[in-house]
From Swiss-Prot:
Described function: Catalyzes the formation of N(7)-methylguanine at position 46 (m7G46) in tRNA.
GO molecular function: tRNA (guanine(46)-N7)-methyltransferase activity
Keywords: Methyltransferase, S-adenosyl-L-methionine, Transferase, tRNA processing
Enzyme class, first EC level, given as a word: transferase
Protein name: tRNA (guanine-N(7)-)-methyltransferase
Record: residues binding S-adenosyl-L-methionine: E44, D69, D96, D118
Signal peptide: none
InterPro entries: SAM-dependent_MTases_sf, tRNA_(Gua-N-7)_MeTrfase_Trmb, tRNA_methyltr_TrmB_bact
Matching Pfam families: Methyltransf_4
Pathway: tRNA modification; N(7)-methylguanine-tRNA biosynthesis
GO cellular component, one term: tRNA methyltransferase complex
The EC number(s) this enzyme carries: 2.1.1.33
Amino acid sequence: MRVRKRKGAEEHLANNPHYVILNPEDAKGRWHDVFGNDRPIHIEVGSGKGGFITGMALKNPDINYIGIDIQLSVLSYALDKVLASEVPNVKLLRVDGSSLTNYFEDGEVDMMYLNFSDPWPKTKHEKRRLTYKDFLDTYKRILPEHGEIHFKTDNRGLFEYSLASFSQYGMTLRQIWLDLHASNYEGNVMTEYEEKFSNKGQVIYRVEANF
């Protein structure tokens, strides 16, 4: 979902280097040094306005979180949430999800989240979907053996495509929810998008998958 260009967004990010890693390639292989501890590292690709990553960081202070989004204005809103929450265990990156191996060593990330990714519904755009096999190649490299992906969407077509993509890649579909908010699943942290559309009755799909 595109967000209107925000005036001063670039300066906002540049003025907060404690949270926004401006040269993430320099952190490759040393993310524990960046955080100053050896706690697990979880990343969210397509972190949007930061509601999920901030909520997870508040809920799990013993885990380090990295929110990743390519959109400048969106990431600046995520920074607002991080600053307001004063969470010490969050960093933000403005990079593309296809280039993660430039910023993380093999096995350096413990878990990753894909929340409400662009569905790219046209067949000619299949390679842009974040659950396309080329993206899975990248994720597999930066995650440990049997690394885990948690995926949420409100788009039934993307969900079915992603289940098939995970399965064809040889991943294990550990748990599947066809209506997350109607289930007994506890501990769900919502994104801004999820909260908005679930309040309108939109069904939310979720899967946990392992390599």
